[in-house]
């Protein structure tokens, strides 16, 4: 049974909402782009500098034209998430609403984990190693965070554009640091993002899915970390006619995406030995 477009959009939105709620990094990257993701590539704006040329205006001669401080890079959409949840014993037009909701939630969660892992790897491979491999301690964690912050400020990243994803071990050290501001002291809007606190003006998130247990923190930003996605095949419930599943259907859909760190020096990865 074919799904109408309105229902496909609703299902796709529900899956995407769960994906966003599950994935940390999908909410922290820059989502701006020009083009059509499903075509295989898009153009992403890359800010060249924080410094915008300016001078006094002359009422007689006007002002000299300057070029925009933004260039564009091509982001290849080369990753593919899919939804293919079997609904055994129910044809597409007879699936209970509760079961639909359950499968959409499951699909969104699985996609969120997969997306988060891909974006994590994008940061680790596209970022820059920071400092030495000496493990952080209660006495050094604040100093190292501030040193990393300073490096990004020198690269013209505003503190409000920075974010930090810390391992559970690093979070434990931050909790013992008097400079760390716990989430309970932050505004509701910040808490709603999943932040666990703030240090040096940087919003901090705990991340427990680093494949490399030597990673202590990543200091990233919402300017030069890019993530673009779109539904190549919107989510729908479809009858299975594969000759193997009788009287069954599946929730199916495909979400394509790509990610990039356009300025490696603005993503700092702190690892221990």
Model-derived features with residue positions:
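Long, hydrophobic/aromatic-enriched structural stretches that serve as scaffold segments
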Residues: 64-101
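Short, Φ-rich (hydrophobic/aromatic) sequence segments
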Residues: 11-20, 24, 28, 144, ...
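Extended oligomerization regions of viral-like shell subunits
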Residues: 38, 42, 46, 150-233
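Alpha-helical scaffold segments that mediate packing/assembly in large oligomeric complexes
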Residues: 89-157, 268-273
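Short, glycine-/Ser/Thr-/acidic-enriched flexible segments
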Residues: 49, 211, 223-224, 256-258, ...
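N-terminal "assembly arms/tails" that initiate or stabilize quaternary assembly
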Residues: 1-73
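Short helix/loop capping segments that flank catalytic or ligand/cofactor-binding pockets
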Residues: 52-55, 86, 95, 173-176, ...
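Extended, compositionally biased alpha-helical segments that mediate assembly or anchoring
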Residues: 239-273
